[in-house]
């Protein structure tokens, strides 16, 4: 009388595994900090070893001015790596102000692990600019709407043009750059420290607009603001009904773009299937 039971049990078990696999997520950490790392080349091997030991993939950049990158893995692995970066012996307290944004991915968004050595963690090609010494005023996501709604504030998107096409803030100027090192040319053509008294800048995770703020201050601009944590922090913090963001935020991994709540585009589309407008 139990002849049919094993077959039914196997079917239930198999479908349960498929459902579980679909629901498994990877934790993604976007991180950066401008910090003096004169020994950056010596940090590459132990950082690779640390990430590999916890099954982490992604890309991290090390330079004399700090660290930048995005990594992904299971939650325990990401948490262990972040703990070592911020409080462990490897960086000896030099990354205790690490800027972090966490999101999830329905599948591993990176194929491999890379730790690269660079002259700059974000390339501006302006050696006189030192964000470890001087940057603009950080603006929290909760205060961003009020700032960029001020008609006296010039809002600047510091990202490249293909990113801007996917989404940006209302009133934002598009520098139409192909790479960040072209941003100073945009400034010299478009902005004037004598006329443009207040500049508010933003980028994906905060690193480009932070370095851009240091550049503008060096060029004589007096009131320079930048979105702390970038667009990702804004989308994580601000509900859609209060948002001034238009479109999606491009990210440099296989998820391609994120929306409010840092939901990846494909997942958002799947969840909306069958809904009436």
Residue spans of the language-model regions?
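Short, Lys/Arg-enriched N-terminal segments with co-localized hydrophobic residues
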Residues: 12-23
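Rhodanese-like catalytic fold shared by cysteine-dependent sulfurtransferases
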Residues: 21-137, 159-200, 207-277
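Internal active-site segments that recognize and position negatively charged phosphoryl groups
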Residues: 142-163
